[in-house]
C-alpha cells in the first residue's frame, strides 16, 4: 500500500495511522469487520444480534490482548503499550462499558428471580465421593473465585451458589477432575463456567507452542473447551460465557453445525480462549487446521451422558485421543449432566483421572419445585385436553413436547387456528428459523413453544411455568430432562403429561419418580403398573433394558466390585456417530415421516 505520494508504507506504520483497521474497530466504525457484518451482529442470529457485534469496540476484541489466535503479533501477550487484558503477567480488567453491560445483563427487573423455594435447595442431600474432597463453599467469595468473576456474577443477579456450585467451585479450583450429577435447572452451567473462568482470569493465557510462533496460518488455541450435544445448548452456554467474561482478557466463541463454516473461521481470527462447540463442527475445524487443542487446560462435557450414549462417542474420542489435546494427566476434565447411567460412568473412566463424583439429590431425579400431573388421555382426545389446559389453567410460557416433527408442525398450526401465539422448533427447521422461534418464546412474543426432543435437554429458557408432555418419551431419563425445563433456579413450575397404553414401557419408572418427588400418583397409573407386573410386562427402561428402580444411578460405581466394573470394559462401542442429532435429524422424532417442513408455522 502507498501513501498519497505513491511511496510504499510498511504495515507497522499503516497500523499506527488514523485510517488503520484497528482504529476503526476502536471507534466502532461501520466499516470495521468487527461492527455489523460478522457472526455476532447478523440480523438472523437471534439472541446474538447486536449493534457492533458482541465484542463491541477494541477493548473487547483486540487480538493482541490475550493468547487465543495465531494472528497475535507478539505471541499473544498484551501487545506493545496494551493497558488492559493480560499485561505483564497480570490481569487488568477493561473499563466498564454501560452499553455492553446493558446488552449482556439487562435491567435488574429483567432477571429471573430466585423462586420461593430456592432456599429449600440447602436441604437437598449432596454426596461427594473420592479422595480428599475439598470443603464446600457457602457463598460466592474470593478466594476461591476471582474478583472480576464475582462482579459479573453479581451483575447477573446471583446472590448465592446452588448446591452443585457449592461443591464444583472448590473442586475445580483445587485442580480435580469432576463428574457432577444434579437436578435439571440447578445451576450446572455456572457450576463449570464460574471456576473455569475464574482460574483463567487468575492464571492468564498459556504461551503458544514454540514451533507455531512463525506459522503463516491463523489458528486458534483455546484454553478451555466445552462440548455440547446440540447447537441450541452450545449457543446457550456461549451466551452465559459472554456475561461472565465481561471486561476480561478471555474471549468466548461458539461453533456448531448449520451455520456457515467460513464465517465462523473468519470470526475466530479475532481470537478464542474459551470455545463452545458441537462435536461434528469441531472435528471439521480440526481437520481444516483452524483450531489446535494443544493449550486446552479445561475440557468440559455438558450433557455428557447424551453425547456418549446416543452416538457421539467416536467423535469425542477422536477429539480427545487422536488430536493434539493434552493427555488426561495434563488437563482437567469435567462432566456435567442430570443423569449418569452406570454404563456411562464406566465410559467416563477413559476421560477422567482420580475424579470426584458429585451427586446432588438423587441422580436422574426431578425437582420438588415441579408439580407433576399425569392424566389418562387417549390419542384422539389430546387436542381437546390440551385446549382445556391452555384455556383454563395456564398463565405464562408453556413448552409442549411431541414425538415427531410432523406432529410439531400440525399441532402448532392447530394452536394458531385456535388463536394461540405458538411457534415450533424441531430438526427440519433451519437454524435461522429455530433461533427466531427460541427468541420469540424467550421474549414472550410467542407464549407456546411446540418442540420435539431437540429442545429437551440443557436449554435454560427463563420463566417457563408449564411443560406439557403431549407425547410421553420412551425413556424415563428423557422425561426428567423435559419437565426440567420448568421449575428452574428454585422457581416453581407445573408439568402435565398425557398418558395412555402407548407409554406403558415407562409406567413403573414414572410411578417411582412421582413417589420420590412427593407427587400425587394417579390411581389409574398404579392399577396399570400392577396389571403389567402381574403379566410380566412394562417397567423396563427402553435404553438400558434394566429396571431403574428407586435410588438407582445414585452411587459412584468405582465402589462396585471388579467384576461389575469389568462387565463393560473400556472398549470403544459401535455407537452411531452423527453430529446432526438434533440438527438435521431430531432426537426422539421420526426422521422418516416424509413431512416437508413449513417455514411459516409460526403465528407471526
UniProtKB/Swiss-Prot annotation:
Provide the residue span(s) of the region labelled Disordered. 1-79, 535-591
Show the GO MF annotations.
Answer: ATP binding; ATP hydrolysis activity; RNA binding; RNA helicase activity; translation initiation factor activity
**Protein name as it appears in the record:** ATP-dependent RNA helicase DBP1
Q: Which residues bind ATP?
A: 182-189
Q: What is its main location?
A: cytoplasm
Annotated Helicase ATP-binding domain ranges read 169-358
Q: Which reaction does it catalyse?
A: ATP + H2O = ADP + phosphate + H(+)
InterPro entries annotated for this entry?
Answer: DEAD/DEAH_box_helicase_dom, Helicase_ATP-bd, Helicase_C-like, P-loop_NTPase, RNA-helicase_DEAD-box_CS, RNA_helicase_DEAD_Q_motif
> Which keywords does this Swiss-Prot/TrEMBL entry list?
ATP-binding, Cytoplasm, Helicase, Hydrolase, Initiation factor, Nucleotide-binding, Protein biosynthesis, RNA-binding
What is the gene name?
Answer: DBP1
Report the subcellular localization. Answer: Cytoplasm
Entry's Gene Ontology cellular component terms: cytoplasm
Q: Which residues cross the membrane?
A: none
Return the domain comment text from this UniProt entry.
Answer: The Q motif is unique to and characteristic of the DEAD box family of RNA helicases and controls ATP binding and hydrolysis.
Which Pfam family, any one, appears in the UniProt record?
Answer: DEAD
Residue ranges of the motif Q motif? 138-166
Record keyword Oxidoreductase present: no
Q: What is its EC number?
A: 3.6.4.13
Q: What role does this protein play? A: ATP-binding RNA helicase involved in translation initiation. Remodels RNA in response to ADP and ATP concentrations by facilitating disruption, but also formation of RNA duplexes. Redundant to DED1, may be required in conditions in which DED1 expression is decreased.
Q: Which family does it belong to?
A: Belongs to the DEAD box helicase family. DDX3/DED1 subfamily.
Organism domain of life: Eukaryota
Q: Where is the composition biased (Polar residues)?
A: 32-45
Residues forming the motif DEAD box are 302-305
Query: Where does the Helicase C-terminal domain start and stop, copy by copy?
Result: 386-529
Q: Where is the composition biased (Low complexity)?
A: 541-552
Stretches with biased composition (Basic and acidic residues): 553-565
